[in-house]
Amino acid sequence: MQTTRRTFLSAVGAAAALGAAGGAKIPESLAAEPRAANVPASSSEKVLFWVAACTPCDKNLKFDEELYKDLLAYLKANGADGVVVLGTTGEFPSFSVTERKKVAETAFKHRNGLNIIVSPGTTNFPETLELSLHAEANGADGLLVVPPFYYRRPRLDGLTKYFSMLFEQVKIPINLYHIPFATGVPISHELMHAMEKYPNLTGIKDSVSDPKVYQDFVAEFPKLNMRTGTTENLKYALDHNMGAILAEGNNFTKQIAAVFDAKRAGKDLTETVAKLEAALKLLRAGGVDEYGPMKYALSLQMGTRQFYQRPPNSDVTDEQKTKIKEALEQIKQMG
């Protein structure tokens, strides 16, 4: 996982009870007022904020459906337009195909107006297609598809055939996922151009922090939604009427939503982006750069029992817990 980009919503109270009983409702003090009017959540709407949602497990490392329901409600209440289900932050490689279907079905059941993009990618085409068709049949608004990984440097013709097979069998909007530091397989401009013949090519998620890489994507494909996956490129994305899919949205839903609200209101983004970056810096310094600490911080923010993750991702340490609580308190003082 890239530097795990999470932190805190300004409405968060001080450290909430970790031992809250299962399926706790969102504390009223943490739930932001819904927007006066929902932003259209169609896949053709570009300037939307998707959270790359984490996937909570219980202490026995089973998918925690109740906590996931609470998480979706929390993200919606604090301003998210949509979520990506089982992306990198959602730990998709840690779940079986059957489990991934259950997680997606839980999201569909409790979407409450959220735009839902499912990440169905695997190392092989049959399972990727199976998960894609399942998402399509159950009401997904779109897909975010990672390239097949493990094989070293597959050629353009092989990747073109792989994605063409998918586009020819799935009709909902499809976005390609550029995260080469994790997959070893970049999404090239040539591959994107090869897919442009399919009308349901919607765009990408670019999770590379390099501004030039992202800016080149935007310049080359201005009609598609070239969503940024990093806060470093957020202002540039919004300045060019593109969306974002952000892992930081788990812990910073409200702050990121404020940036999008400023964009929609035609306001200058400098102040809201600076406030977001300051809060991000504090929690990152507090140790939230792994799944365990990120999920621990989120459980404090939501006031629920602890979110767990599966190995090989490590549990949060006592030292990290202390630092996270201190960072959350500092962020609270920022207002």
Task: Write out the residue ranges for each language-model feature.
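Catalytic alpha/beta core domains of metabolic enzymes, predominantly
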Residues: A182-E277, L283-G287
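N-terminal carbohydrate-binding accessory modules
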Residues: P34-S43
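Alpha-helical structural signal in soluble globular domains
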Residues: K102, T106-H110, H134, N138, ...
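N-terminal secretory signal peptides and thylakoid transit peptides that target proteins
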Residues: M1-A15
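Signal peptide processing junction and immediate N-terminal pro/mature segment
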Residues: A24-R35
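Structured C-terminal cap/extension of enzyme domains
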Residues: A16-L18, L238-G335
